Regions:
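Mid/C-terminal beta-alpha module of Rossmann-like enzyme folds, strongest
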Residues: 211-270, 293, 303, 307-310, ...
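Conserved Rossmann-fold NAD(P)-dependent oxidoreductase catalytic core, especially the SDR/UDP-sugar
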Residues: 92-136
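N-terminal Rossmann NAD(P)H-binding glycine-rich loop of SDR-like oxidoreductase domains
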Residues: 3-23
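Flexible, glycine-rich beta-alpha linker
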Residues: 158-175
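NAD(P)H-binding glycine-rich loop region in Rossmannoid oxidoreductase-like domains
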Residues: 45-88, 92, 98, 116
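Short alpha-helix in the Rossmann-fold core of NAD(P)-dependent oxidoreductases
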Residues: 83-90, 97, 108-111, 140-141, ...
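Substrate-positioning beta->alpha
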Residues: 143, 171-175, 188-210, 216-220
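Active-site Tyr-X1-5-Lys
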Residues: 132-158
Length: 319
């Protein structure tokens, strides 16, 4: 079983690469010339040089049974950069795969709950709900989905919409761990989120690639629980054995924080696009379809996962 992973050097992609190897796949990783290979160094993988934004560099994508497309940007300096990375890049990789992979068994696109948007009524979002992304990131991930769906009948595919993903190597949730450790965390009222530990996600991704029932389908993936912002703070606090002060911040101040963060560092985890998402209080999804159709069975809940994540951060001097 020959598999190609794009985005293999990133947080989720590196975990997926390790899991594919453990499951007996022969893995190739599409990497750019300037990619940081620290998470896949020493793994028994082949490196294929290419860039999803450059169609000419993708001509060597040939003879794969499975393609897992994770490459993209969660935080971009501007809208055009996000479009090129998430939407145009997906179109390019889809076209490249179609040309030279006649025995392809599955193309798996890792999208995001951001493509569906927040829950409009407080109920967990299902896969058949009308998509209403509120951020540039969400809109470009939805654009990527549309390119994949446009290949129906020409290419077997599955689209995965993960909820908030966390675990070792995650740089996004790290900022909240650091805030808790510092002893002060901004709090703009109770919000609700779906989460999923990274090991459970990659197991679900591989499961979806192998199941015939997943062909042509979209699946939300979460651990099945709904966590309030208080639950999240409490889980991280317990993991770090800290008790931070919650600094009340009105939601009206969120855009101002985003502007300041954007000027301090482009692509920051707290940039204006990400804060646009945080203005909404229900980022929850139902994983019922994945559970019933695929037998998806996540094992790790937030309290346990936060402990494992904090241990990894400490061991690697991230905290």
């Amino acid at each position: 079983m020959k598999a190609l992973v794009t985005g293999a050097t990133g947080f989720i992609g590196s975990h997926l690469t390790e899991a594919l190897l453990k499951n007996g796949f022969s893995v190739s990783c599409l990497v750019r010339n300037n990619s940081n290979l620290r998470y896949i160094e020493g793994l028994n993988v082949s490196l294929l040089k290419g860039d999803c934004s450059d169609p000419e560099s993708l001509k060597d994508i040939q003879g794969f049974d499975y393609v897992f497309h994770l490459a993209g940007l969660t935080k971009a300096a501007n809208e055009q950069e996000s479009y090129i990375a998430n939407e145009k890049g997906t179109e390019n990789i889809v076209n490249a795969v179609l040309q030279n992979n006649p025995k392809l068994k599955r193309f798996v696109y890792i999208s995001s709950l951001a493509a569906a948007g927040p829950s409009p009524d407080g109920h967990p979002v299902s896969e058949d709900a009308q998509e209403k992304p509120v951020s540039v990131y969400g809109k470009t991930k939805l654009g990527g989905e549309q390119h994949v769906k446009g290949m129906k009948g020409k290419m077997p595919f599955t689209i995965i919409r993960p909820s908030a993903i966390y675990g070792p190597r995650d740089g996004d949730l790290l900022v909240f761990f650091r805030m808790v450790k510092f002893g002060l965390i901004p709090y703009w009222g109770k919000s609700y989120y779906s989460f999923l530990y990274v090991d459970d996600l990659v197991n679900g991704i591989i499961l979806s690639a192998r199941r015939d029932e997943a062909n042509g389908e979209v699946f939300n993936m979460s651990d099945g629980e709904i966590y309030s912002s208080d639950d999240i703070i409490d889980s991280i606090s317990e993991a770090l054995q800290c008790r931070p002060l919650r600094l009340a911040v009105p939601k009206s101040a969120i855009p101002i924080i985003g502007v300041i963060a954007g000027r301090i560092k482009s692509g920051s985890v707290v940039n204006s696009d990400k804060l646009q998402e945080l203005r909404h209080s229900h980022w929850t999804c139902s994983n019922k379809k994945a559970v019933e159709k695929l037998g998806f069975a996540p094992r790790v809940k937030l309290r346990e996962g936060a402990k494992w994540t904090s241990d990894w951060y400490r061991i690697h001097n991230w905290l």
